[in-house]
Design a protein with these regions (language model features):
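Glycan-association/targeting regions that enable binding to alpha-glucans and other polysaccharides
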Residues: 2-170, 176-188, 252-263, 267
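Canonical alpha-helical transmembrane segments
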Residues: 70, 176-181, 206-213, 242-245
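Non-cytosolic membrane-interface motifs at loop->transmembrane helix junctions
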Residues: 158-164, 219-232
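Hydrophobic cores of alpha-helical transmembrane segments in multi-pass inner/ER membrane proteins
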Residues: 167-178, 234-249
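Interfacial segments of alpha-helical transmembrane regions
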Residues: 187-202, 259
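Aromatic-anchored segments of alpha-helical transmembrane domains
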Residues: 201-210, 264-274
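Juxtamembrane "helix-exit" motif on the non-cytosolic side of transmembrane helices
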Residues: 210-222, 275-277
Length: 283
């Protein structure tokens, strides 16, 4: 009877330990999702400036669809403030182009002209102008500044392709975390978790990832050996790390260290903002 009770107690401890590790893995994954959703070169640049004695908040897009104008607007609620939208092609010696912004319902509004090339990039900013009371001189402010914001134009990716890509990629991160955490259990179950981790990485990163890139930029793969796309390269590095960990499960006397190493490398990779050095494939 005492032996049975002891066995049940051990099983309960193992179950609680497993649940705890799953909770930690889920929390880290959620934090990672939030981090990826607020960093990187494709998410809107937010901030504020103080002009004419008032704070003006802005949110400037850094990603837009090809073949349609990209709206640019900021809320100022002051019809005496004038605005100009200024832009040029990114990384060129082109002269800047400029057009006045319209005042509509408290907003200064304009548009960046549509682009017909995938991965085309424009560098743009807004110039605010206002006359000083009792003076003919104008004061100016630049949003965000004269160096501007770089916006990249892409093709339209089917909704379900995006959804499944995101689902598989973050499931890969979740499983990689849980697999690595098995290192801290007395009876780790590396093998099944490692196979699941590799499968999710293959589908999310090596099948759906290139498909997303093809729809967005017209190329399936622009990482090694064809280019320097960091999103592609970090995915292939993570996948290779888990293949090495899988081999270690059969060949190494201490495979747990290889699994833990693959997990740590995966975490580091997910700390790199999404789309850095990506989509540089203009036609």
């Amino acid at each position: 009877m005492e032996e049975q009770t002891g066995t049940e107690t051990n099983l309960g401890k193992k179950k609680r330990s497993n649940i705890f590790l799953w909770i930690v893995a889920v929390l880290i994954t959620i934090i990672s999702i939030f981090y990826q959703n607020t960093t990187g070169p494709t998410y809107p640049q937010k901030g504020h400036v103080v002009f004419n004695g008032k704070q003006i908040d802005y949110k400037l897009d850094r990603s837009a669809l090809i073949n349609q104008d990209c709206p640019v607007k900021i809320y100022i609620n002051d019809s005496t403030i004038k605005g100009s939208l200024i832009w040029k092609r990114f990384n060129t010696r082109d002269n800047e182009s400029s057009k006045p912004m319209r005042y509509e319902n408290g907003y200064l509004v304009s548009e960046l002209d549509k682009q017909d090339k995938m991965a085309a990039k424009l560098q743009y900013y807004i110039q605010l102008s206002s006359s000083q009371p009792g003076s003919q001189n104008e004061i100016h402010e630049y949003i965000p500044d004269k160096s501007g914001v770089v916006i990249r134009f892409r093709g339209d990716v089917p909704f379900m392709v995006i959804i499944f890509h995101i689902l598989f990629i973050f499931s890969f991160e979740l499983l990689s975390l849980k697999t690595g955490m098995e290192f801290f259990r007395k009876e780790p179950k590396y093998k099944a978790y490692t196979f699941w981790t590799i499968g999710l990485a293959a589908v999310g990163g090596l099948i759906l990832g290139p498909l997303v890139q093809y729809y967005a930029f017209g190329e399936f793969w622009t990482g090694f050996p064809f280019g320097f796309d960091l999103t592609d390269n970090k995915m292939i590095i993570a996948f290779a790390a888990w293949i090495v960990a899988l081999i270690a499960l059969y060949k190494s006397k201490k495979p747990g260290y290889w699994v833990l190493g693959a997990t740590i490398l995966t975490i580091v990779i997910f700390l790199i903002p999404h789309s850095v050095l990506s989509g540089n494939v203009p036609k």
